[in-house]
């Protein structure tokens, strides 16, 4: 019995240590002001090797699935975006630094990377994935397309996920006209703010190099719920 308890304590210690490492390497965005107020300032001061900009064109796609905070900026959102590569156009700005990727965080109302601006204007609808610090599994669904945002909430809840419509008064609602999400042809967007706890649960190993290989059933249930709404509403 004593050995069993020691083993349990050891396992818990390892889990807590790994969790600490994950958070220290990829801390969530803080309430501190961004280092850069726009992309040109970032590009002038950061090495091109420290970030990546990618765009996947899907001919005939009305929807652009994107995140300006991919890679190691808000862990787990890149994998969510890339899941949709075969059905929709996708865009990612990703942090690749070994540490301090929060310096690459540009808030969505200031994010003006040229390729993102160009491609968003070529699509009718935008679906953006983001991360926030929440310690409980939850998704705040915002954006200007409130009708479809509510549908996303219901679809996630039917799959057993905690989700809610972001309050219009919340800073995470994604309603500002300056938000990069809202600059498409129709101005209609869906913005998903996903808690850290929920994003970690999508992978058996949250370490950034291993995430794409360790997506689990919770990941696929989540994206399937979203995909169902997009196929019905934006086809």
From Swiss-Prot:
Its main location: membrane. It is found in: Cell membrane. It comes from the Bacteria. The chain crosses the membrane at residues 5-24. The keyword Transit peptide does not apply. It holds the Pfam family Gamma_PGA_hydro. Keywords: Cell membrane, Membrane, Transmembrane, Transmembrane helix. Induction: Induced by mitomycin C (MMC) and UV, and this requires RecA. Also induced by hydrogen prexoxide. It is a single-pass membrane protein. Disulfide bonds: none annotated. The keyword Nucleotide-binding does not apply. InterPro entries: Gamma_PGA_hydro, Gamma_PGA_hydro_sf. GO terms for cellular component: plasma membrane. Belongs to the UPF0714 family. This is UPF0714 protein YmaC. The gene is ymaC.
């Amino acid at each position: 019995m004593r050995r069993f308890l020691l083993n349990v304590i050891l396992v818990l210690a390892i889990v807590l240590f790994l969790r600490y490492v994950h958070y220290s390497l990829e801390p969530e965005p803080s309430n501190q002001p961004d280092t850069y107020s726009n992309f040109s300032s970032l590009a002038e001061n950061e090495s091109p090797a420290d970030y990546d900009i990618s765009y996947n064109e899907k001919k005939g796609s009305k929807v652009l699935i994107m995140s300006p905070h991919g890679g190691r900026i808000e862990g787990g959102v890149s994998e969510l975006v890339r899941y949709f590569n075969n059905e929709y156009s996708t865009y990612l700005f990703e942090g690749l630094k070994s540490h301090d990727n929060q310096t690459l965080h540009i808030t969505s109302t200031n994010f003006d990377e040229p390729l993102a601006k160009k491609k968003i204007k070529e699509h009718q609808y935008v679906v953006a994935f983001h991360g926030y610090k929440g310690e409980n599994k939850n998704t705040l669904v915002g954006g200007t397309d409130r009708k479809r945002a509510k549908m996303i909430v219901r679809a996630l809840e039917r799959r057993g996920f905690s989700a809610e419509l972001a309050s219009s008064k919340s800073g995470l609602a994604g309603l500002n006209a300056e938000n990069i999400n809202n600059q498409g042809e129709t101005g209609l967007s869906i913005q998903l703010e996903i808690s850290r706890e929920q994003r970690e649960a999508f992978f058996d190993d949250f370490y950034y190099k291993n995430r794409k290989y360790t997506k689990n059933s919770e990941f696929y249930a989540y994206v399937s719920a979203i995909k169902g709404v997009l196929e019905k509403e934006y086809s």
